[in-house]
C-alpha cells in the first residue's frame, strides 16, 4: 500500500499510485520505486505476486552486483579459497557450500543488515575447510568473527527469507 515500508541492505521500498495504466519499477539511488495504477487493489493475489516478483528482481540484481565481490574480499582477508559463487532464490538456506568449494548464496541475504550478511558469507567460507558443523568448524567461525559466532547465529534466527 501507500504506507509500505521495507529496508534492505542497499535499498528501501517506495510503492506509490500513479495515473499510468501499467505497473513499473525502477531502482534508483537506494530506492526501489514501484508505481501502481491508481485503482490497484493491493489485496488482490495477482498484485501481491507482481510486487513480490519486482522485489525479488531488485534483490537478485543487488545480490549479483555485491555479494560475489564481498565474498571474495572476505575470503582473501581470512585466507579462504572458493571455486565459484552463485546467487539463487532459496527459501530455506541463506547459503551453502559444495565439497568442490563452490558457494551458493540466497538473494534473501540482501534483506539482512551487512554484519549478518558477512556472518553468512564467513559461515560458508568456513565450510570450504570444515564441511560440517563440528567443534573445529565453530572454532574457525569464532576466529573469523572475533568470538561472536554464537551471538551472530542467534541474531540471524530473528530474520526470515523472502
Q: Where would I find each of the regions flagged by the language model?
A:
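Walker B beta-strand of ABC/ABC-like P-loop ATPase nucleotide-binding domains
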Residues: 121
Amino acid at each position: 500500500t501507500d504506507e509500505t515500508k521495507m529496508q534492505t541492505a542497499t535499498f528501501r521500498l517506495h510503492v506509490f499510485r500513479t495515473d499510468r495504466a501499467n505497473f513499473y519499477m525502477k531502482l534508483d539511488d537506494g530506492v526501489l520505486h514501484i508505481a501502481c495504477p491508481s485503482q490497484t487493489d493491493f489485496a488482490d493475489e495477482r498484485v501481491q505476486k507482481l510486487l513480490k516478483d519486482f522485489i525479488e528482481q531488485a534483490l537478485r540484481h543487488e545480490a549479483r552486483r555485491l555479494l560475489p565481490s564481498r565474498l571474495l574480499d572476505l575470503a582473501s582477508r581470512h585466507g579462504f579459497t572458493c571455486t565459484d559463487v552463485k546467487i539463487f532464490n532459496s527459501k530455506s538456506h541463506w547459503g551453502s557450500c559444495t565439497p568442490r568449494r563452490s558457494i551458493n548464496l540466497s538473494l534473501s541475504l540482501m534483506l539482512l543488515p551487512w554484519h549478518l550478511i558477512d556472518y553468512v558469507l564467513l559461515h560458508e567460507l568456513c565450510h570450504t575447510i570444515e564441511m560440517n558443523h563440528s567443534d573445529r568448524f565453530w572454532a574457525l567461525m569464532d576466529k573469523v568473527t572475533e568470538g561472536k559466532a554464537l551471538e551472530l547465529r542467534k541474531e540471524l534466527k530473528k530474520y526470515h527469507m523472502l
